Amino acid sequence: MSIDFKAKQSEFAAYIRDPDNNPAPPDVKAQRITMYRELFFNNIDNFLSSNFPVLRQILDDRQWFELAQDFFARHRCQSPYFSEIPEEFLAFLQNERANAGDFPFLLELAHYEWVEMALSIAKEDAIADQHQPENMLEQRLQVSPLAWPLAYRYPVHKIAPAFLPVEAPAEPTFLIVYRDLQDEVLFLEITPMTYRLLDILQQNDSVSAKDGLKQLAEESGHADPATIIAAGLQILETLHEKTIIRLAA
């Protein structure tokens, strides 16, 4: 009798992924398939643990195993590359994971940790202008591709075993995660107005710093736009020193 290889392969893979809900192939030794199962799962488990260290730290062993196993059993990765498993894990958390017992910030924390990994392996090089530009207000500026402005409901950069918020604060958290000239990934907490200013620069790289700050002042409804422009200039100078922004090409 011929063996349907694809059917046998599917049967084998189903058990490897989810042994609690799929029977082991009857013609494979239990010791052998258990070894394969542990090998596959441990590879995924170790990769997730190394890329989401804070998430791993705040979950006990049972919680972590259940989360990793749920991902391993149910998610169908679209990429064959190990380096893209963290992004696949994010897609799983956003679209497939449905566990009322999860921390409410779980997805945001995972995204924040993924950003650090993604920036660390990004192919772009950090580039700094040779000097602080004169009359920065008249310059066109752009946000570095290695600087990502982010907004979260939870203060994800503070989450730790000793700080596990159960409700989102009244105000969101705004961050820039960026890679510097030494290829170190850093973060900077910013104000909502700084976040909006960077958004303006990203939306239109032909706008000058002054025009961007004027737009910000108009949107804020501030009684003294000159104050916004002066404060904004100081912020831009700081961001430029950190290579978060640079002169537009």
What are these language model-derived features?
Residues 218-232:
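Short, positively charged loop/turn segments that connect secondary-structure elements
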Residues 231-243:
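Basic amphipathic alpha-helical segments that dock to polyanions
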Residues 206-217:
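Short acidic, hydrophobic short linear motifs in intrinsically disordered regions
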Residues 1-122:
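N-terminal, charged low-complexity regulatory/assembly segments
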Residues 33, 189-190, 224:
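Residue-level marker of regulatory loop/turn positions in helix-turn-helix DNA-binding domains and
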Residues 73-196:
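Hydrophobic packing positions characteristic
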Residues 200-205:
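Short helix-to-turn junction characteristic of helix-turn-helix DNA-binding domains
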Residues 246-247:
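Short beta-strand "wing" residues that participate in macromolecule-binding interfaces
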